[in-house]
Amino acid sequence: MAAEQVEDNCISFVEMKFINNTLYFVAENDEDLESDHFGKLEPKLSIIRNLNDQVLFINQGNQPVFEDMPDSDCPDNAPQTIFIIYMYKDSLTRGLAVTISVQCKKMSTLSCENKIVSFKEMNPPDNIDNEGSDIIFFQRSVPGHDDKIQFESSLYKGYFLACKKENDLFKLILKKQDDNGDKSVTFTVQNQH
């Protein structure tokens, strides 16, 4: 039995150019090159909790807040407690690219535009032709903790979704992660069947 020939994945460059102190290579054939983008894959239905075991919940004002809620109450409060996490194929390798949406009366997708966390009334797009987006987060496991997750903004490097107490509410915010073991940026994600 003969071995199959492996396709050549090399790019032949025919020219180099300096533009504004940056060296660019011109490919002989760029048909197979892929531009930076995110492409939507399959969704997962999930419940998201902070480390105080409070459930992420969409309140009447369409704002993401955390509330004390036993597991038995989560299905009764669906769809405000069930989040649709769409995974995206990323043309760069930076972690699992996801959007976080909720289907209450209408589909809303989590955004961190201008570093303010809110839900935008929109379906997550099939493709995002950019390497950063206010609705794309990189879902990463916390080293040494299989069940702990962090969500880093693709638009604001080093900024993560976090839980913060404001007055009597625990809100979902975007914050720069500090190096002191900040637990406010860590969550558990429980996938639903």
Swiss-Prot record:
One of its GO terms (molecular function) is cytokine activity. It is found in: Cytoplasm, Cytosol; Secreted. It holds the Pfam family IL1. GO terms for biological process: cellular response to lipopolysaccharide; defense response to Gram-positive bacterium; establishment of skin barrier; immune response; inflammatory response; interleukin-18-mediated signaling pathway; positive regulation of inflammatory response; positive regulation of NF-kappaB transcription factor activity. Gene3D superfamilies: 2.80.10.50. GO terms for cellular component: cytosol; extracellular space. The pro-IL-18 precursor is processed by CASP1, CASP4 or CASP5 to yield its mature, active form. The pro-IL-18 precursor features autoinhibitory interactions between the propeptide and the post-cleavage-site region, preventing recognition by the IL18R1 receptor. Processing by CASP1, CASP4 or CASP5 induces conformational changes to generate critical receptor-binding sites. The mature form is then secreted and released in the extracellular milieu by passing through the gasdermin-D (GSDMD) pore. In contrast, cleavage by CASP3 inactivates IL18. InterPro entries: IL-18, IL-1_fam, IL1/FGF. Residues 1-36 form a propeptide. The keyword Transport does not apply. Keywords: Cytokine, Cytoplasm, Inflammatory response, Secreted. It comes from the Eukaryota. The keyword Secreted applies. Its main location: cytoplasm. Pro-inflammatory cytokine primarily involved in epithelial barrier repair, polarized T-helper 1 (Th1) cell and natural killer (NK) cell immune responses. Upon binding to IL18R1 and IL18RAP, forms a signaling ternary complex which activates NF-kappa-B, triggering synthesis of inflammatory mediators. Synergizes with IL12/interleukin-12 to induce IFNG synthesis from T-helper 1 (Th1) cells and natural killer (NK) cells. Forms a ternary complex with ligand-binding receptor subunit IL18R1 and signaling receptor subunit IL18RAP at the plasma membrane. Mature IL18 first binds to IL18R1 forming a low affinity binary complex, which then interacts with IL18RAP to form a high affinity ternary complex that signals inside the cell. Interacts with cargo receptor TMED10; the interaction mediates the translocation from the cytoplasm into the ERGIC (endoplasmic reticulum-Golgi intermediate compartment) and thereby secretion. This is Interleukin-18. The gene is IL18.
